[in-house]
Swiss-Prot record:
Gene Ontology cellular component list: plasma membrane
Family, similarity comment: Belongs to the BCCT transporter (TC 2.A.15) family. CaiT subfamily.
PANTHER family, sorted: HIGH-AFFINITY CHOLINE TRANSPORT PROTEIN-RELATED, L-CARNITINE_GAMMA-BUTYROBETAINE ANTIPORTER
Keyword tRNA processing attributed: no
Catalytic reaction annotation: 4-(trimethylamino)butanoate(in) + (R)-carnitine(out) = 4-(trimethylamino)butanoate(out) + (R)-carnitine(in)
The protein, known as: L-carnitine/gamma-butyrobetaine antiporter
Alphabetized NCBIfam families for the sequence: bcct (TIGR00842), PRK03356.1 (NF002887)
Main location (coarse class): membrane
GO BP field: 4-(trimethylammonio)butanoate transport; carnitine metabolic process
Pathway info: Amine and polyamine metabolism; carnitine metabolism
Length: 504
């Protein structure tokens, strides 16, 4: 019995430091929002302007790593001795499901507006050239390049899971081949895990900060309930309580069903937008945008704008690369776990093709719809953002479609379910990472899960209180900096161990 309690207890060295650090930062922010915004702007400017190039080189190097895996000595190596756990169709569907979060719905609907109103390469705002590049840049930021970087890390984690038979719930577990067991399980490993957890907490709080206003704006549109910060806080509280009830009552099967419903509803809603918005235009715009992407790809890869200093690569490319970096470990662990029995080449190709198709469909359909609404003067996005905020502008891109009430109900349900599953996943991941020897498939303690969901909810509320996108972007970039190095160490550790232990 004591042994069982030990297994389900918290791990103090990785539980309390992130809790204290995040708690102090939240307190300092709430204490003086104006001063916090000044610091946020300074941090954002420093990291993106001084170190933005490093994120760009990181993505390029990881892309070369993907080619090495696909065509190198490990291409035909199998990740485990068992046959694949899931059929290829189910495997790809699970990948798609991982892409349909409310944060993705947020960016997919509004991102193109920012690209055409503040375009790269010195183009005139809202010009034909800016519109031609708008979707192309979305395809760049959410296309093969970032998924290729995830492929490398997914192979690394799958190798440690299924070839080396290691229990990996924190990144330090994978660093034994690189730094030795003493350091991996000592102070160095603890520091690495704490960096990972603090960054992950902020990333999840950021996702909640993006998702919540979509739900509350839907409520205003459907029920006439005014959207306020207090309503955001109430909705987040309800999600936390609902998550606690689901966990306490053993309703995790219900949460998994909700996740499946989210995926099917995503297909349905995207299909609806595709049909009624303008299928012919969407396909033509996508085709043209792929050509623009191929034409400008070298410039996009290395674009830092040091002369004109327009700020586009810092505000978007570096931000998104930090976004990908910060979620890399969590996402790669999930993708690795569903890829048991596949070869390295299968995993790399499957991820890049399957996940790129998922994100490209989302961004093409939603972005094209937004551009059409702008061109036809059906909605005035700058005015909506200035008066009501970004979330209202996104809601109006959906409300402008035919059968607006039915469309809004569908979008409301989709966002609500997506956020319920987000809160559940947040609490589960953080609880698993901060508890002692909770093994895969076991449930971490209820109070720990509730505690982490509360903290993530608080961060979401704090970011919403700060207002605007800059605090959200800064939280991602600041969190991405330490994980930049952690991801590299995990990659190097895999390469070193594979050379020694994964021979013919």
């Amino acid at each position: 019995m004591k042994n069982e309690k030990r297994k389900t207890g918290i791990e103090p060295k990785v539980f309390f430091p992130p809790l204290i650090i995040v708690g102090i930062l939240c307190w300092l922010t709430v204490r003086d929002l104006d001063a916090a915004n000044v610091v946020i702007n300074a941090v954002f400017s420093y990291v993106t302007n001084v170190w933005g190039w490093a994120f760009e080189w990181y993505m390029v190097v990881m892309l070369f790593g993907w080619f090495w895996l696909v065509f190198g000595p490990y291409a035909k190596k199998r990740l485990g001795n068992e046959p694949p756990e899931f059929s290829t169709a189910s495997w790809i569907f699970m990948m798609f499901a991982s892409c349909t979060s409310a944060a993705v719905l947020f960016w997919g609907s509004i991102e193109i507006y920012y690209y055409i109103s503040t375009p790269p390469f010195g183009l005139e705002p809202n010009s034909t050239g800016a519109k031609e590049l708008g979707l192309a840049y979305s395809l760049f930021h959410w296309g093969p390049l970032p998924w290729a970087t995830y492929s490398f890390l997914s192979v690394a984690f799958a190798y440690f899971f299924f070839v080396r038979k290691m229990e990996v719930i924190r990144p330090s577990s994978t660093l034994v081949p690189l730094v030795g067991e003493k350091h991996a399980k000592g102070l160095f490993g603890t520091i690495v895990d704490n960096f990972y957890l603090v960054a992950l907490i902020f990333a999840m709080g950021t996702s909640l900060g993006l998702a919540t206003p979509l739900v509350t704006e839907c409520m205003q549109w459907l029920f006439g309930i005014p959207h306020t910060l207090q309503l955001d806080a109430i909705i987040i509280t309800c999600w936390i309580i609902l998550n606690a009830i689901c966990v306490a009552c053993g309703l995790q099967k219900g949460v998994r069903i909700a996740s499946d419903v989210r995926s099917y509803l995503s297909f349905l809603m995207l299909g609806w937008v595709f049909i009624v918005s303008g299928a012919s235009f969407i396909m033509n715009y996508f085709t043209d945008s792929v050509g623009m992407l191929l034409m400008y790809l070298p410039r996009m890869l290395f674009y830092t704008d040091p002369i004109a200093k327009g700020g586009f690569p810092q505000g978007w490319t570096v931000f998104y690369w930090a976004w990908w970096v910060i979620y890399a470990i969590q996402m790669s662990i999930f993708l690795a776990r569903i890829s048991r029995g596949r070869t390295v080449r299968e995993l790399c190709f499957g991820m890049v093709l399957g996940l790129t198709a998922s994100t490209w469909i989302l961004w093409t359909v939603l972005g094209s719809n937004t551009l059409l609404l702008i061109d036809k003067n059906i909605i005035n996005i700058p005015n909506l953002i200035e008066q009501y905020g970004v979330a209202r502008a996104i809601i109006e891109t959906w409300a402008a479609l035919p059968l607006s009430t039915a469309t809004m109900w569908g979008f409301f349900i989709l966002c609500f379910i997506a956020t319920v599953t987000l809160v559940n996943a947040c609490s589960y991941t953080l609880a698993m990472s901060t508890c002692r020897e909770v093994r895969d498939g076991e449930e971490p303690p209820l109070l720990v899960r509730i505690g982490w969901s509360v903290l993530v909810g608080i961060i979401g509320i704090v970011l919403l209180a700060l207002g605007g996108l800059k605090p959200i972007q800064t939280a991602i970039i600041a969190g991405g900096c330490p994980l930049f190095f952690v991801n590299i160490m995990v990659t190097l550790s895999f390469i070193k161990d594979a050379k020694q232990n994964w021979k013919d």
